[in-house]
Every structure is written in C-alpha cells, then in structure tokens.
Amino acid sequence: MTALFENPTHNLEAQGLRCPEPVMMVRKTVRKMEEGETLLILADDPSTTRDIPSFCRFMDHTLVAADTETLPYRFLIRKGSN
C-alpha cells in the first residue's frame, strides 16, 4: 500500500490542525487542482478518518487510499470520480 502514496501531484500537511480545518484546507486545495490530479494529505486529527472519506463521497472525488493505522494518517484523493 505504501507505493500508492508515492508521487502525488500535490501534498497537504494538516498535522496539528483540528476539525474543521483539515477538510477546509483539502477543499481549498482541490479547487485549484485539475481533474485527475492527486492530493496526499497528512493529518493527525482523529476526525479526519471520517471527514475526508465523507468529503470525497459528497464532492464526487475518489479516495484512492487511506492509511489510518498509525500517525500521521495518510489519505490519497484524486480529483473527480475517474
């Protein structure tokens, strides 16, 4: 699974931030991305384990991978549902 997190198009460092800041930053970053680009998010707020997958479903983006077993949590999303 580690290979999935290599070479994202964009990176977002959200460690130390608390709800709702991480998802707000994800939304702002994704708005500037092109369709199909990827974003690697590093976070340590437990609420991101439900908020980021929910954001992807609600906004029709793809959650490519999530690693929430250890800190920092890692999420890889692709803009759009392709």
From Swiss-Prot:
GO terms for molecular function: sulfur carrier activity. Its main location: cytoplasm. Gene3D superfamilies: TusA-like domain (3.30.110.40). It comes from the Bacteria. Keywords: Cytoplasm. PROSITE patterns: UPF0033 (PS01148). It is found in: Cytoplasm. One of its GO terms (cellular component) is cytoplasm. The keyword Cell wall biogenesis/degradation does not apply. InterPro entries: Sulphur_carrier_TusA (IPR022931), TusA-like (IPR001455), TusA-like_sf (IPR036868). GO terms for biological process: tRNA wobble position uridine thiolation. The active site is at C19 (cysteine persulfide intermediate). Belongs to the sulfur carrier protein TusA family. NCBIfam families: PRK00299.1 (NF001423). Sulfur carrier protein which probably makes part of a sulfur-relay system. This is Sulfur carrier protein TusA. It comes from Photobacterium profundum (strain SS9). The gene is tusA.
